[in-house]
Amino acid sequence: MNQFYQSTTGGQQNNNNGNQFQQYQPQQQQQFQQYSPSNANNNNTTTTTTTSTSKKGKNKDNQSKQQQIQQQQIQQQQQQQQQQQQQIQQQSVDTPSSYNGDGSDDGSDTERENKKNRNRVNQNLASRNYRQRKKEYIKEIEEKLAVLALENDQLKKENINLKKGGGVEIMKPDPAFITMMMEAKQIIIQLDVAIKKNDERSLIYLLQLFHLSIEKRHTIVEREVEKMVHPYTQAKLAAMGYVPSLENPMISSISGPSSDGWWTMYISEAQITEEQAKAIKQLRSNHWKADIELRNEREKLDRSIKEFYLNRVMVFPTNERLNKSFATNLSLSDGPNPTSPNSSSVTQSTLVRPSPGLTLLNNLNEENNNSNNSSNSSNNNTTTNNNNNNSLTPTPNQNNNISNIAVNGTISVVNELGFSPINGNIDISEILEFTRKLEALKKNFVKQRTLMEDTHSALSSILTPKQEAMLLVRVHSSTRYDFANMEMLKNVWGSVIAKDTTSYPQPPTFSQQTQQLQQAQLQLQNQTKQQQQQLQNNNNNNNNNNNNNNSFNNSNNNNVQNNSSNPSTPGGNNDQQNIYYTSSPSIPSSPYNHHQQQPSRQ
């Protein structure tokens, strides 16, 4: 093995093998030469010359065969050596290592250490990148949380201001509406600059932008109208007695008769022709007529909506109602029947079952009546039972005092004025009619807005771009809506209201009180259940006692009839008494029954 590792190339090894083979052949030849003379001498001594020649030929054949066999063996050895060298080379390629003379594998150890170092470096890089990404993600989440915290604080402040009455969000303009107004103002400023420069292309472009902004503003205005037409807003306006102004200053300053003065000045300044002036005049008159129709419709709708609120939702005392109430002497408990005021009987349709509280009171009254009237005769008992059973039905005298009993036990009086001031139920048809009126009011406002847009588009078709730009600059130069001032006013008002409310004492907390109330309610519920069970048991006992009394009285009546039909003899009376006493043990023994037996003996 050491010879193979010390050799550097395979060629040198092959040369060495060849030299060994050459050395091996002369030795064999010498041995063969030594062997052949000895054999010849031996043959000469034992045999003749003829036999010696034949043996020599055979020996030559054997020698040739042996040489061939030896050559084959040498070739096999060479092949085995080559295979071993190839295996060693493959092992060195697969696992490169530098062997020392002692056989230690220092190369493999260094490779393992290098691999470990590489893996460690890769793991460190991966962990460093992960920590970096984690820090960035946490930082991003913290920033979002900070933004949300600021928004939450702002919303809390706004809610506090709303609770204190500092601002009404329903009246706050939409942010989109504010942006649209600011964009329109910027377009007007750019139109003024383009007019001064006499740039028609920029005028056309800016006018197109202005028309687009008006179309976008339509949807925003519709949302603002929905806020104003909301039932809560209309209820507040009706309660305050607010009546809106029917004349819109924006419309009257453009299409009204009072706007003729500045229109004439504009016609002369913009150099409008006679045909254009006639078309503008006709357009203004048509716009004014349509606006008058919309105003009349809006006035009727507003009046009917406020009447509904003041008659069906928020009923306030008026002179007419007070005069009628004093004239007819009406009150909450004795109002006339709305269907038949002069009738003397209550129909089943107007009577509704009473509340559980009323039934409990009636049951208590029944118990008291039964206990008080227990000592009366059978006829009185039967009449009292009938009266107690019919206590829920009103008598003709009670008809004038009862108008209607609601399902929940509350009184609902419908007086002669046609409305119910307490718990008045509204029909579904009335609610639907009222919603139609609100929808019509919303459409009225939207129609007025579309009328303005249509008038503006008609004017743009009549005028040239420069004339239209001059008109817009003149009209909108005097219009201004400062939203910053509005917000400042709202904030100042909120701070003033907050100072006023801080002077009042804060309301107490009701956490413990609510728990006590809940416990008290549970106790009351348990007590009412127990009372109802006791009342049922007492009613059952009373019914049994009444049945026994009826049977006892019937037996007494039969005895009296027998005594009246038969002649009165002492023996007969004793017999009747004996019969009575023999039949008396069948009655169940109770203090009430024993008390009823004593008068019969007398």
Swiss-Prot record:
Query: What ranges does the record give for the region Leucine-zipper, renumbered to this chain?
Result: 138-145
**Has the keyword Transcription regulation been applied to this entry?**
yes
Which Pfam families does UniProt cross-reference here? bZIP_1
UniProt keywords (A-Z) are:
Coiled coil, DNA-binding, Nucleus, Transcription, Transcription regulation
Q: Which SUPFAM superfamilies match?
A: Leucine zipper domain (SSF57959)
**UniProt family annotation:** Belongs to the bZIP family.
Q: Which GO terms describe its biological process?
A: cellular response to differentiation-inducing factor 1; establishment of protein localization; negative regulation of gene expression; negative regulation of programmed cell death; positive regulation of gene expression; positive regulation of sorocarp stalk cell differentiation; regulation of gene expression; slug development involved in sorocarp development
Subcellular location, principal: nucleus
Official protein name in the record: Basic-leucine zipper transcription factor B
Q: Kindly state the subunit structure of this protein.
A: Binds DNA as a dimer. Heterodimerizes with dimA; in vitro. Also able to form homodimer; in vitro.
Positions the record marks as coiled coil are 58-94, 509-552
Domain bZIP stretches: 113-176
Name of the gene encoding the protein in the UniProt record: dimB
Chain residue ranges for the region called Disordered: 1-128, 328-401, 525-602
Q: Where in the cell is it found?
A: Nucleus
Question: Null mutant: what phenotype?
Answer: Following starvation, development proceeds normally only until the finger stage, when extremely long and thin fingers/slugs are produced. DimA and dimB double mutant has the same phenotype.
Its function, per the record, reads: Transcriptional regulator involved in DIF-1 signaling. DIF-1 (Differentiation Inducing Factor-1) is a signal molecule involved in the differentiation of pstO (prestalk-O) cells. May be a direct activator of ecmA.
Region annotated Basic motif, chain positions: 115-135
Q: Name one GO molecular function term.
A: sequence-specific DNA binding
Keyword DNA repair listed? The answer is no
Q: Which InterPro entries match?
A: bZIP (IPR004827), bZIP_sf (IPR046347)
Enumerate composition-biased segments (Low complexity). 11-54, 66-102, 336-350, 358-401, 525-592
The UniProt entry's GO CC annotations, sorted and at most eight, read: cytoplasm; nucleus
Biased composition range(s): Polar residues? 1-10, 593-602
